[in-house]
Amino acid sequence: VNSLKYVIIGNSAAAVGAVEAIRKNDTGGRIVIISNENHHTYSRPLISYLLMGKTDEEKMKYRDNDFYIENRCDLILGKTALKIDDSRKQVILDDGEKESYDKLLIATGSSPFIPLIEGLDSVRNKFTFTTLDNAKHLESVLKENAKVLILGAGLIGLKCAEGISRKNVKTICVDLSTRILSSILDDEGSRIIENHLKKSNIEFYLGRQIVEFKENTAVLDSNI
């Protein structure tokens, strides 16, 4: 029986689970992991705790350092899969390289939504908050008494707010919804969490939206 070649795009929880499941059923097949990050597999939900100083990069890892060696995985890190040629069973990378496969798993997770707001390109320091590099970059530019604006009062936005609130910075959250975490909590739950976060010097503008950025100043709608 010919061994299969498995290609996994992504290197987080789903990829780890896939590797372990493959090895339970196929000990000889080749596994290739492609990720646009340069890190060992880690827990993305913990990046806010990294900002808070409650964890470090080593503790964030899903598996031991020898996980890839033990499971005989070939790593392609720091490269992005741009296209899948299903007819030829190839993944085309951003450097032009092609990786063939017999079985392909896309395990990249979600991508942050970036709204189209006039002037956003003029903002000097702007970040999404889903990866370890995002958290490290944000931490590198945070200064004492700085003011941070977070667009969105969902789970990711609030975890970011919680993480940076301990850095002695002013944190402001703006959301179109009239309450925080509206997709997962009822009115009372939202109110309890909001009151708790306000004690950490986090300010909320709810039921509001940003209509324009003028360099590092945000212009909110007229509902003020």
Predicted ranges, named:
Residues 1-7, 64-149, 218-224:
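FAD-binding core/adjacent interface of flavoenzyme oxidoreductases
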Residues 2-74, 161-184, 188:
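Beta1-alpha1 glycine-rich phosphate/pyrophosphate-binding loop at the start
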Residues 10-13, 130-131, 152-156:
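Glycine-rich Rossmann-fold phosphate-binding loop(s) that bind the pyrophosphate
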Residues 15, 44, 61, 114, ...:
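A general structural signal for well-ordered alpha-helical segments in protein cores
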Residues 26-28, 68-70, 76, 121-123, ...:
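Short, well-ordered coil/turn elements that cap or connect secondary structure elements
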Residues 38, 111-112, 211:
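Residue-level marker for beta-strand->alpha-helix junctions and adjacent short loops that shape enzyme
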Residues 75-92, 99, 167-224:
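A Rossmann-like FAD-binding core segment of flavoenzymes
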Residues 105, 117, 137-200:
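Compact, aliphatic and Gly/Pro-tolerant "microcore" segments centered on a short helix or tight beta-hairpin
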